[in-house]
Amino acid sequence: MKPFLRWCYVATALMLAGCSNHDWRKDEVLAIPLQPTLQQEVILARMEQILASRALTDDERAQLLYERGVLYDSLGLRALARNDFSQALAIRPDMPEVFNYLGIYLTQAGNFDAAYEAFDSVLELDPTYNYARLNRGIALYYGGRFPLAQDDLQAFYQDDPNDPFRSLWLYLVEREIDPKAAVVALQQRYEKSDRGQWGWNIVEFYLGKISEKSLMERLKADATDNTSLAEHLSETDFYLGKHYLSLGDKNTASVLFKLTVANNVHNFVEHRYALLELALLGQEQDDLSESDQQ
């Protein structure tokens, strides 16, 4: 392609991309990405001192390694977190909370069978550890085992019907089984809830009760500081991304998943699985490129 023609092609593509953006994105709602706090850094330094210099019992060392792993995870330092979790488990192999984190990491890596086993271990050690049902349900969802995912997420929803995100994850799974019935079920859950939490605004968008622009206006009005804005954006951008993905608009979905990640709310489920969504979209693109070359 000649340089001038190539320039025209790129310019046209950029113009079309700009036209396809929704109006509200002209005034995009953005937060300052969350950064480690001084308190978190001080706690990490103190933990390091205790682990290095004090004689600890095995239980104390395992617990401290777990707590440091959780802190590393919240800062996005997942390799360090995994190392601490593995060390804690080597000392005390009966820690359900450690298996839960390892199951999440295995899900993010696409190693679904191993993730199922990790979450099974959580529930064997502690049948009341309900977040393992959420995380196993999500792993089953990404693994394409929708009826089993529905069972787990239904049980997790029943534990707190007023939590909008439990309804949303259950809806995402039910949509894969029967889209029309999924909308009806989401509407019923919406009507039964007290709708006191921010996330019900996202449910209203999914049900067609409000527009995307109204959703973003509510988000901006509801945020009290940068932290709450970043958290709400992580949640909202992820579920908007899932919405556009269901419509086949992978480009918009990809942008929204990247915006989810950009807020640095590392310990939110939406941040974790936005990374997986991007990996899956990237794999689709790689597969398409390979097929074009054959």
Swiss-Prot record:
Regarding the membrane, this protein is recorded as: Lipid-anchor
State whether keyword Lyase applies.
no
According to the record, the segments passing through the membrane are none
Keywords in UniProt for this one?
A: Cell cycle, Cell division, Cell membrane, Lipoprotein, Membrane, Palmitate, Repeat, Signal, TPR repeat
Gene3D superfamilies, sorted: Tetratricopeptide repeat domain
- One GO BP annotation of this record: cell division
One GO term describing the cellular component? cell outer membrane
**Mainly localized where?**
membrane
Q: Where is the lipid attached (S-diacylglycerol cysteine)?
A: 19
Which Pfam family is an annotated match for this chain, by its short name? TPR_8
Q: Give lipid-anchored residues (N-palmitoyl cysteine).
A: 19
| Signal peptide span | 1-18
Spans of the TPR repeats? 62-95, 96-129, 234-267
Q: Where in the cell is it found?
A: Cell membrane
Identify the NCBIfam families for this entry.
PRK11189.1 (NF008391)
Summarize subunit and interaction data from the UniProt record for this chain. Homodimer.
Function noted in UniProt: May be involved in cell division. May play a role in bacterial septation or regulation of cell wall degradation during cell division.
Per its record, how is this protein called by name? Lipoprotein NlpI
Organism encoding this protein: Yersinia pestis bv. Antiqua (strain Antiqua)
